[in-house]
């Protein structure tokens, strides 16, 4: 990875995932697509582009189910490979509830941020909204 030199851009951006879970995809990972404003189906691994560093500012997760709470996992696959690094594991979100993760963290080129609903249920319907700073050098 190149070292930032002072030239380049720093832009505030956002992306989202809608319909996470939806029963059929229980326990399947959905990846954030940094080049898209919204992911509405299970995406293959979408990684941070070369010559970019992303600072995640906040992650807002909303459970749209009217009847059930669901546990959510949030994790990072690092460019160096190895094990999945969990940032949230079985974080329970009440029905019609919202969870806000506002600890900052950094993603480097080839890292991937991913989410999954960690419970088998047909009524899960979760939205994820991610705001971040994209530093391109």
Predicted regions and their residues:
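Short proline/glycine- and polar residue-rich coil/turn motifs
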Residues: 91-97
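Short, surface-exposed beta-strand/strand-loop-strand elements in extracellular ectodomains
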Residues: 66-89
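Extended, low-complexity, turn-rich repeat/linker tracts enriched in Gly/Pro/Ser/Thr and Asp/Glu
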Residues: 62-70, 119-126
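Noncatalytic modules at the cell exterior or secretory-pathway interfaces
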Residues: 104-122
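Beta-strand elements of well-folded, non-transmembrane domains
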Residues: 63, 76-78, 132-136
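C-terminal interaction-tip segments
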Residues: 1-52, 117-137
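Exposed aromatic-hydrophobic patches
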Residues: 98-104
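A short beta-strand element within beta-rich, extracytoplasmic domains
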Residues: 53-64, 115
